[in-house]
């Protein structure tokens, strides 16, 4: 049984968010929350919020034990790029590309050995 949570159109670069996602992939939820709490990156609290939502979904929708959950999958997909103009000298303009991300967290129960 798997529980998931998805956050779409998050204003953070997918490349930078993937660096944080790689830290928690395969970890149990308590360890993942601790790692995200003390990671000093912009995407860490955003990913932590999605992880909390996935834990709540697992408890409420599937009656899973929150202490036995593992981050089985976490992936960051690219969202649409928001383009803005930046004025430059002599009447020119540059395009600023604000990247967005879709964050997906999938949890499963730890296998009993």
Curated annotation (Swiss-Prot):
The keyword RNA-binding applies. GO terms for biological process: translation. It comes from the Bacteria. GO terms for cellular component: cytosolic large ribosomal subunit. One of its GO terms (molecular function) is structural constituent of ribosome. Pfam families: Ribosomal_L22. The keyword Zinc does not apply. Keywords: Ribonucleoprotein, Ribosomal protein, RNA-binding, rRNA-binding. Signal peptide: none annotated. Part of the 50S ribosomal subunit. This protein binds specifically to 23S rRNA; its binding is stimulated by other ribosomal proteins, e.g. L4, L17, and L20. It is important during the early stages of 50S assembly. It makes multiple contacts with different domains of the 23S rRNA in the assembled 50S subunit and ribosome. Belongs to the universal ribosomal protein uL22 family. This is Large ribosomal subunit protein uL22.
